[in-house]
Amino acid sequence: MAIDEGLLEWVKEALEPLGAVSLRKMMGGATLYLDGTVFAILHEGEIWFKADEETNALWDAEGCERFSVTFKDGRVDTMNYRRGPTDVYDEPEAMQRWARLAVEAGLRGAAKRKPRKSRPSAEPNPNHST
């Protein structure tokens, strides 16, 4: 399925005061980044914002369901992304408010991940001046 270009443009326009929105295509949708931090996915013409333990109650209070995927074998998997409230599609302030929460969740998630093991560095080059 193609990415909803109109929705993508709206997100970029609405969030311009907060930073630059970029994307990475994935399985018929796109992962969205705000200044390099994952904050949402676009899937089937809808925006799903990143959530976490700290923000789940806010999403629940708005009635924003959790993103789920049903596999061919019938298994269902959920991810901690929440359907955007209806006002994010036409009110820049609403888009900004919910995107800020999602970016904060993205930053907390990134901080919790273990850092990758670094590769052993090469021996210093004695001919290279610093």
Regions found by a protein language model. Name each.
Residues 1-130:
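Charge-dense, helix-prone N-terminal extensions
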